[in-house]
């Protein structure tokens, strides 16, 4: 079928044993060599089926072009990423990732998997959800991105004498995700984009950029990007006071900023990191209230902003022991989970949602 984007294919497969129907969606975009892929699973049987893994895209034979051995012609590009160390692309041979040939091509089927995985809603904390597979003999490049702001997984391995690539969102093994699919219920995988070009890594990125521009929803930011000043990075580093903010507001206004954001620390008399969660202004930092600074920001022709990290609560937050019980937080093995002196709020609890509403209101 054709639509506003281009051509769309839907391939339907059915498993008689489980009654599961899979629809593989392939949306092509006119003017690009990129296809958007995802899968829909429907339980058309009479029993509940537990889904532990759903691929968004799978392709076997990614190394077929050319006559050389896979390890002599294939390179896999990985985008390492971390806090303050971003977008570190590195290429590897198949031998370097443990996937060198070890048997006759017709018998090649190892247990080795080379994979990149993310667990949780920090979707790029170790890797960017992308990859590139380059065939240096054929001069071709296969590239992909997983369009997911949560858990995801991609893997490269060999089976049946060929190498395969699989892309997915969360799974049972990698991220403790599963879904009990009742009869007549459907579930949709995360979306991903896969493309192919003749040329180089740079050519692949050019093509992916064209695709990204096509799928980006229309919004005012496309035509006009606001100038925003935030007082945290390379500035106050979470130690704001009214005295410090006023000259910054003046400088930001003079520089032409349109928004001014007061970042972390405005709510804590002392060290702000582990006291976060109550979201009440510190009168020690702002004797006349944060509103005084916000009004001054408006007076200077800018829109004020205030930093909130509503999903966490520090272990020294006054609410932790006075109001909250364990049901407010993520727990593991019967105990609250905390990381770097903070608890993670569980928004399935209506009391947590009410707390968030009260903070904003």
Regions of interest found by a model, annotated:
Residues 39, 184, 229, 252, ...:
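Conserved, mostly hydrophobic/aromatic
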Residues 51, 267-322:
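Acidic/aromatic-lined carbohydrate-recognition and catalytic surfaces
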Residues 224-226, 237-240, 283, 310-361:
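Active-site-adjacent "subsite" loops/lids of carbohydrate-active enzymes
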Residues 244-267:
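Catalytic domains of carbohydrate-active enzymes, especially glycoside hydrolases
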């Amino acid at each position: 079928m054709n639509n506003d984007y281009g051509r769309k294919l839907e391939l339907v497969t059915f498993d008689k044993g489980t009654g599961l129907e899979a629809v593989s969606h392939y949306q092509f975009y006119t003017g690009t060599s990129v296809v958007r892929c995802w899968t829909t699973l429907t339980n058309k049987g009479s029993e509940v089926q537990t889904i532990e893994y759903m691929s968004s895209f799978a392709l076997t034979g990614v190394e077929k072009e050319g006559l050389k051995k896979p390890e002599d012609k294939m390179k896999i590009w990985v985008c390492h990423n971390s806090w303050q160390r971003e977008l570190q692309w590195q290429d590897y041979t198949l031998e370097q990732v443990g996937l060198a040939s070890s048997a006759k091509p017709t018998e090649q089927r190892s247990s080795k998997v080379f994979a990149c995985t993310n667990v949780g809603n920090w979707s790029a904390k170790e890797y960017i959800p992308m990859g590139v597979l380059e065939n240096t003999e054929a001069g071709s490049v296969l590239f992909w991105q997983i369009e997911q702001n949560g858990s995801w997984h991609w893997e490269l391995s060999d089976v049946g004498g060929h190498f395969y690539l699989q892309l997915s969102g969360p799974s049972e093994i990698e991220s403790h995700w599963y879904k009990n699919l009742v009869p007549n219920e459907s579930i949709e995988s995360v979306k991903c984009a896969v493309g192919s070009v003749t040329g180089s890594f740079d050519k692949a990125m050019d093509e992916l950029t064209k695709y990204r521009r096509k799928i980006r929803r229309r919004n005012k930011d496309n035509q006009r990007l606001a100038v925003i000043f935030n007082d945290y990075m390379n500035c106050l580093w979470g130690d704001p006071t009214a005295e410090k903010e006023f000259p910054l507001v003046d400088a930001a206004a003079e520089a032409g900023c349109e928004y001014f954001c007061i970042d972390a620390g405005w709510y804590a008399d002392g060290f702000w990191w582990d006291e976060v969660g109550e979201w009440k202004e510190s009168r020690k930092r702002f004797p006349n209230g944060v509103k005084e600074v916000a009004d001054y920001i408006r007076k200077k022709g800018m829109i004020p902003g205030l930093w909130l990290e509503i999903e966490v609560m520090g272990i020294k937050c006054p609410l932790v022991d006075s109001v909250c019980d364990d049901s407010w937080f993520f727990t593991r093995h019967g105990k609250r989970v905390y990381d770097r002196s903070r608890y993670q709020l569980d928004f399935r609890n209506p009391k947590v949602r009410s707390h968030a509403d009260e903070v904003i209101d």
